[in-house]
Amino acid sequence: MATLTIEELAQTLQPAQAIAGLDLGTKTIGLAMSDLSRRFATPRPVIKRVKFTQDAQVLLAFAEKEKVAAFVIGLPINMDGSAGPRAQATRAFVRTMGEKTALPFIYWDERLSTVAAERALLEMDVSRAKRAERIDSAAASFILQGALDRLSALTRAAD
């Protein structure tokens, strides 16, 4: 497994390969999936965290079933640009996942993704209980959509 930049990913992806987005939390892992044309990110049900080994098994089974080509994982950078404990935990998660899969991981700045997801769910008039259930996957979808938009721009620039 390697960590790639979004530019490196753009060079290695084949047509019709899907990408998964992850929002790593302490209790859940938000999950989103791209379509095969890599234009749209769709939230998927969250993964309830148990222990790393079980979390990894669930994530890798999902990746195999959905034929995931890469993971875009939100990197929780502080507003001042520094990396706090959550960013360190995310990097440690990716390092440990690297021992279990050859799939590449791409870090994506997730600043304000949860705020944007919360706002979108509020605009859709989703109840407080349902918002709590869906917020992590909605945030994963925002993270993935940002990466997909960047991939699209890189592809257009290369043509």
Swiss-Prot record:
Gene3D superfamilies: YqgF/RNase H-like domain. It is found in: Cytoplasm. InterPro entries: RNaseH-like_sf (IPR012337), YqgF (IPR005227), YqgF/RNaseH-like_dom (IPR006641), YqgF/RNaseH-like_dom_sf (IPR037027). The keyword Membrane does not apply. One of its GO terms (cellular component) is cytosol. It is an enzyme of class 3 (hydrolase). Its main location: cytoplasm. Pfam families: RuvX (PF03652). Its EC number is 3.1.-.-. One of its GO terms (biological process) is rRNA 5'-end processing. Belongs to the YqgF nuclease family. This is Putative pre-16S rRNA nuclease. It comes from Agrobacterium fabrum (strain C58 / ATCC 33970).
